[in-house]
Structure formats: C-alpha cells, structure tokens
C-alpha cells in the first residue's frame, strides 16, 4: 500500500519523539495499553479471573503484530480496533486459550480507539511540557 510521505518536512516541523508518539507503532501500542489496563481493572473488581491478566498484558506489545496485515484488515473493517482486537485474541490464545475469551470484555471499538488516542495525547503533552 502506497502512503503519502512526509520525509521532506517531518524532521523540520516535528521532533522525532513526537513523531514516535503518533506513529503506527505508537497508535497500536496505545490501544494495546488500553486493553491491558482494561483487563487489570476488570480483574480488580472480579469481572474476569486474575489469571487472565498476565497473558493479556503479555500480548499487549505492538512488536507482536504484523502492521502490514493490520493495515489491510483496517481497510475492510472500517476502524483500527476491530482487526487489532482480533489479532490480540489470537496472540493471547497462543499462550492461554482460556484468557482469550476475556480480552476486550465489555468494551467497544470506539473505547479502544478513543482511549488509545487519549494516551497518545497524554504522552504528547508531556513532551511539550518538558520542552517549555
């Protein structure tokens, strides 16, 4: 898939650290951070077994995922969360098939995307504040 390039101006207008926050890797990791936090919160109130948290959290590393495949799936799914949550479930099932059923429990795709974006914005604000 051909993407527009910003190579001529990215370094001029944006710091590397800020580009990292809003990169594909940063976006996916932020949504995965939401999924791990959701599992921890749900386990803390007894909604899911505490034994499900470790396999879910372990699978919430962006490096586990094929970004090209995610990009293709996003094009047909209509949003980024649907294929990411499916891939997350498959990754969890490799370690603990029982834990897979608890991933994304009670959450919507919009929850994952919005919460991920807020985590990115938090990181961006910290960079801006540190630079003042």
Task: Report each predicted region and the residues it spans.
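A helix-coil-helix interface module used to build multimeric assemblies
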Residues: 1-132
């Amino acid at each position: 898939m051909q993407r527009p390039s910003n190579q001529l101006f990215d370094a001029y207008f944006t710091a590397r650290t800020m580009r990292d926050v809003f990169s594909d890797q940063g976006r996916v990791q932020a949504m995965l951070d939401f999924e791990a936090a959701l599992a921890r919160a749900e386990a803390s109130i007894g909604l899911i077994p505490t034994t499900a948290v470790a396999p879910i959290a372990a699978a919430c590393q962006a490096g586990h995922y094929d970004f090209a495949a995610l990009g293709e799936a996003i094009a047909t799914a209509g949003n980024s969360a649907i294929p990411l949550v499916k891939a997350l479930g498959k990754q969890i099932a490799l370690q603990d098939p029982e834990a897979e059923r608890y991933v994304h429990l009670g959450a919507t795709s919009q929850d994952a995307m919005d919460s991920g974006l807020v985590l990115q914005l938090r990181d961006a604000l910290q960079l801006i504040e540190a630079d003042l």
